[in-house]
């Protein structure tokens, strides 16, 4: 019996591949959210924002958190590229937009950011989430798509 697959590995099923793609999208969302919040925290810990290495080196913890945020961005990019390999862009991209909502909701609810909850912004977040859902909905069977 011939086995074309490496020992112990089964061929990837479409469902398994799709799940993997969604997990990569989720990883990208969570990492970019962590990057935004980490960099925000790091920047607000500095006495002033300057591209002055001496100021940054005098505050090593905020600098490390900012650099960790940049690292999270890099990892997020890797997750995003992996997600694009197995997830249609018209599904992955709207899901990625949920990171905007997640960053806002966390910044409002985590006291050290002290972001105000504003009705207009909250409505905007709701529209982002609603848009992501609407773009991701598949048409009902038998429904003709235009375009």
Curated annotation (Swiss-Prot):
Annotated keywords: Cell inner membrane, Cell membrane, Lipid A biosynthesis, Lipid biosynthesis, Lipid metabolism, Lipopolysaccharide biosynthesis, Membrane, Transmembrane, Transmembrane helix, Transport
Transmembrane segments: 24-44, 63-83, 94-114, 122-142
InterPro entries in the cross-refs: Flippase_ArnF, Small_drug/metabolite_transptr
GO MF entries: carbohydrate derivative transmembrane transporter activity
Residues on Periplasmic side: 45-62, 115-121
GO BP terms: lipid A biosynthetic process; lipopolysaccharide biosynthetic process
Annotated coiled-coil segments of the chain: none
Compartments it resides in: Cell inner membrane
Known pathway: Bacterial outer membrane biogenesis; lipopolysaccharide biosynthesis
Any Gene Ontology CC annotation: plasma membrane
Keyword Membrane in annotation: yes
Cytoplasmic side: 1-23, 84-93, 143-147
Function: Translocates 4-amino-4-deoxy-L-arabinose-phosphoundecaprenol (alpha-L-Ara4N-phosphoundecaprenol) from the cytoplasmic to the periplasmic side of the inner membrane.
Family (UniProt): Belongs to the ArnF family.
Protein name: Probable 4-amino-4-deoxy-L-arabinose-phosphoundecaprenol flippase subunit ArnF
Naturally occurring in which organism (per UniProt): Aeromonas hydrophila subsp. hydrophila (strain ATCC 7966 / DSM 30187 / BCRC 13018 / CCUG 14551 / JCM 1027 / KCTC 2358 / NCIMB 9240 / NCTC 8049)
């Amino acid at each position: 019996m011939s086995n074309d697959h490496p020992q112990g590995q089964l061929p990837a099923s479409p469902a398994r591949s799709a799940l993997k793609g969604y997990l990569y999208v989720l990883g990208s969302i969570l990492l970019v959210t962590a990057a935004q919040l980490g960099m925000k925290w790091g920047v607000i810990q500095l006495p002033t924002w300057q591209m002055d290495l001496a100021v940054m080196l005098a505050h090593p913890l905020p600098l490390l958190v900012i650099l960790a945020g940049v690292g999270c961005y890099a990892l997020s990019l890797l997750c995003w590229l992996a997600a694009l390999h197995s997830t249609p862009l018209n599904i992955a991209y709207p899901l990625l937009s949920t990171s905007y909502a997640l960053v806002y909701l966390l910044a409002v609810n985590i006291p050290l950011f002290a972001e105000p909850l504003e009705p207009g912004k909250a409505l905007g977040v709701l529209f982002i989430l609603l848009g992501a859902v609407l773009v991701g909905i598949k048409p009902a069977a038998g429904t003709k798509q235009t375009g």
